[in-house]
Amino acid sequence: MKKTGAVLVAAGLSSRMKDFKPMLPFGGSTVSRHMVSMLKDMDIDPIVVVTGYRAEQLESHLSHMSVRFVRNERYRETEMFDSICLGVEAIASDCERIMILPIDIPALMPETIRQTLMIDAPILRTMCKGEPGHPIIIQTDVFPVIWQNDGHRGLRGAMEESGIPITNLEVEDEGIYKD
């Protein structure tokens, strides 16, 4: 199996909720600690958490978990795509492929992560009932082509416009898109 790292995006303002989603309780822990632990249990390494809003609080909260941090200092005026770019840049030289997912989808099932790790494809996207979600896994040698896109349609648009085949993995896990 190819060495897989992960980018956990946590830079957003949590504007749809009043609370800071990465710090919300989940399963005896918090959303962010649960997500990091789940990835570590699958031997995904390195893991970089892209912070922005309330960066110091989240970085302190996860400091004991052996993850890297990258800050999107412009989180108020940039999109998730920009945070993904920062995270990928931080770990691309340390792995062969990168799993990308937001930090706030704790209902994602470990079995879904296991399934994605078994598939070797330039770009792998999870789907549930025909709807795309996370995680997405992209081989590191594909990123230069994806970065040629300006990100105006996010990572999904950049992947679709790259011309690189996308392998869709249908899973029975609505956690791939439930935040």
Feature names for model-found ranges:
Residues 17, 58-62, 116, 146:
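Hydrophobic packing residues within well-ordered alpha-helices of enzyme cores
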Residues 9-11, 101-102, 126-127, 170-172:
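Short beta-strand segments
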Residues 1-2, 148-179:
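Conserved alpha/beta core of the MobA/IspD/sugar-nucleotide pyrophosphorylase nucleotidyltransferase superfamily
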Residues 26, 70-72, 126, 169:
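Hydrophobic residues at beta-strand termini and immediately following loops
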Residues 76-144:
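Conserved beta-loop-beta/alpha segment of the NTase-like Rossmann-fold superfamily
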Residues 33-97, 111:
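Conserved N-terminal catalytic core of the sugar/cofactor nucleotidyltransferase
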Residues 2-51:
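N-terminal glycine-rich phosphate-binding loop and ensuing alpha1 helix
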Residues 22, 68, 122, 165-167:
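Conserved beta-strand segments of alpha/beta enzyme cores
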